Amino acid sequence: MFSKSDFRGIINSMGLVFGDIGTSPIYTLTVIFLLTRPTEVHVIGVLSLIIWTLITLVTVEYAWLAMSLGKKGEGGTIVLKELLVPLIKSGRNAAFITLLAYIGVSFLVGDGVITPAISILSAVEGLRIIPDFQDIGQGAIMFIAGIIAVALFSVQSKGTEEITWVFGPVMVLWFASLAFSGIASIFYTPGVLRAINPYYAISFLLHNGFTGFFVLSEVILCATGGEALYADMGHLGREPILKAWRLVFSALVLNYLGQGAFIIRNPESKNILFEMINQQAEVIYIPFLILSITATIIASQAMISGMFSIVYQGITTRIIPMLKIDYTSGKLRSQIYIGAVNWLLLISVLFMIFEFRDSHRLAAAYGLAVTGTMSITGLMMTLIFYLKGRMFRSFVSLFVTVIDVVFLLSNTYKIPHGGYWSIVIAAIAFSLIIIYTSGQKKLYELMNPMKIGDFLEKYKQVYASENKISGTALFFARDINYVPRYISNVMFENNIIYEDNIFISIIKCESPFGVKSSFAKDLAKGLRVFEINVGYMEVIDVVQILKDKGIQEKTIFYGIEDILTSNLIWKVFSVIKKLSPSFVQFYKLPSDKLHGVLTRFEM
């Protein structure tokens, strides 16, 4: 049985991991039966498709396969790339995998914009079941959804640490409500239990041709958020998430079966979940509606936190430009707030709400990015298992990837119906990553750093002959074997040399977590190297690390790149660099000690 710590982990997982997939029953079946008639045969077939989609794409792909692949317990698209690239000998193939990972991250961004919009909008539409609100206009529904979204995004800067403890119990209550309402409905139409047999899923696809194929594009809505199992593994641990998934899976299946039973009895139903609850117990409908809106807010909060985490991961692995980051918790450094991401997300979510107007139309745009992410995850897992010689898992992963691709192809029909928006958003994110990484590579080539041997030879001469400034000066250098041009400009052209000069090198490790710092070696008299080895998911306080090691700097020098170019792509890169906070702003180094050194580059 479960221990006390197990229960705590399970409840936390329900609140932080399963919000998205847990709120899918609000709209999934309602949207599906806009595409196909709700006959008993169709209902059983669709239910079977949903159950086996949850089994293959969430349980097998993420809970079993993906969660067996981690780095120090951490999961996600970037982790898969970090695992796969070292296994590949060809540089060209490694570059292709890196490109795939960039596309995967971009799809997650595209998905992240639609999730809060469809979740909140579909829950608010439940107001129409209340007699006094039956005639409420869609404009009012959108306005209420917009107000909820604005309120949610507005509190992010204050941090959510104080209220996250509520998320788990609320979602436990939500899943319990889904399970019990499902059981109550199944009791009157037990024939829906046949849907557990995959025969009915296959039969539905075989007998409905293109309609059946297109229905798959809406069936995938039941699995949106499944990728959170793997992405959040590092925060909550593998075991609590897997144990929570058993309970969540059971609640979801029971509720979908219950909704199926309800629509067999009430084929004219337009908002299946809410009408089912209202018919079962009208007196608890309003509390259930409030609970559903709260659950969608929690799901949206998990998505926002996930986006902050993805962007931070991208910044530390140098695929996304630096952005201003605030720490919203005095206890947990992982509790972060990225203002630029927060407000761009809010604008995008509001655009989705007011562009698509209702959840049915929004569902027509939802799924493309999700299936794209799943397909990339499946392909990368297949290659990892194959290259590690784990053939059975490689075969299963390949089978799941084929299913992912089938779902992806079925979603292509959504492109002219609004699906292009997720592609546009993903394309913007992908273009930003490509321009930034290519620009950084080109800029580094132009920097023409001095080899450490040449630098030391000149340094020793200058240090011995020039008057030295008392105190300690810090210089930041990514690789001490190649000294950045700004350092040689300060020391050799401007003749600014301190008694104690320290090169600070922040080295990103292959592991996601861990921080180690130490003085590496003395390069010469008055010249030392201090290394900070940090995991690519770790949030660090550089100022505190320096203080703990007894470093009392008088001045901090850093490089500023001024880019001159007539090339359009590099002009975009130049604008990105100018709009991005500098290295020292990102790490919040004390402004009264900073001295930026400008170097001009022609690209």
From Swiss-Prot:
Pfam families: K_trans, K_trans_C. The chain crosses the membrane at residues 15-35, 43-63, 94-114, 136-156, 163-183, 201-221, 244-264, 284-304, 336-356, 367-387, 391-411, 415-435. It catalyses: K(+)(in) + H(+)(in) = K(+)(out) + H(+)(out). The keyword Transport applies. It is a multi-pass membrane protein. One of its GO terms (cellular component) is plasma membrane. One of its GO terms (molecular function) is symporter activity. It is found in: Cell membrane. InterPro entries: K+_transporter (IPR003855), K_trans_C (IPR053952), K_trans_N (IPR053951), Kup (IPR023051). It comes from the Archaea. Keywords: Cell membrane, Ion transport, Membrane, Potassium, Potassium transport, Symport, Transmembrane, Transmembrane helix, Transport. Belongs to the HAK/KUP transporter (TC 2.A.72) family. Transport of potassium into the cell. Likely operates as a K(+):H(+) symporter. PANTHER family: K+ POTASSIUM TRANSPORTER (PTHR30540:SF83), OSMOTIC STRESS POTASSIUM TRANSPORTER (PTHR30540). This is Probable potassium transport system protein Kup. It comes from Methanosarcina acetivorans (strain ATCC 35395 / DSM 2834 / JCM 12185 / C2A). The gene is kup.
